[in-house]
């Protein structure tokens, strides 16, 4: 199965996960404050192929790094498969330092963009261990045909970026 997880809307007590699989899946998210030690988990969730699902992990502690992974299986299957471990940090205390990255104008939807160069840029940003990333636009190119673009075309543009954005 191919999947992507994109994190967003972090607060001092929660974070939103957007999860997308390419097959009909059952899964849960395991998470905790020590690498490899997941004391918390969500209920088992069901997702249809190629439809992103957003949900919040709530009741988190501020200024804390959480480690998480998915446990997933084909809908109706018996054995779960663990994903690699990922992490995030909840909002830091006011006045404390943090790290963020900025990216813009990658233009992967037209001849100006280069997938491998964008991948290298994201890998370099990841080395900074950012708390979050700001994107300043020209991400999807949906404004190039503003009056004629279809919902299906928008869905494809957005789906093409998930593998990139899920890595930071």
Which residues does each predicted region cover?
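Acidic, histidine-bearing metal-coordination/catalytic regions of metal-dependent phosphoesterases
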Residues: 1-108, 123-128
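Active-site neighborhood of divalent metal-dependent phosphoester/pyrophosphate hydrolases
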Residues: 95-168
């Amino acid at each position: 199965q191919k999947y992507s997880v994109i994190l967003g809307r972090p607060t001092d007590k929660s974070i939103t996960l957007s999860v997308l699989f390419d097959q009909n899946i059952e899964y849960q998210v395991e998470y905790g404050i020590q690498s490899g030690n997941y004391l918390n988990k969500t209920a088992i969730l069901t997702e249809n192929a190629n439809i992103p699902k957003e949900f919040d992990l709530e009741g988190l502690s501020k200024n804390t790094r959480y480690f998480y992974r998915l446990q997933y299986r084909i809908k109706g299957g018996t054995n779960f498969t663990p994903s690699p471990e990922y992490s995030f940090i909840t909002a830091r205390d006011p006045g404390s330092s943090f790290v963020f990255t900025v990216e813009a104008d990658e233009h992967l939807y037209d001849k100006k963009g280069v997938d491998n160069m964008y991948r290298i840029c994201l890998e370099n940003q990841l080395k900074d261990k950012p708390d979050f990333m700001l994107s300043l636009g020209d991400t999807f190119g949906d404004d190039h045909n503003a009056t004629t673009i279809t919902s299906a075309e928008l869905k494809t543009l957005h789906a093409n970026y998930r593998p990139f954005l899920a890595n930071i």
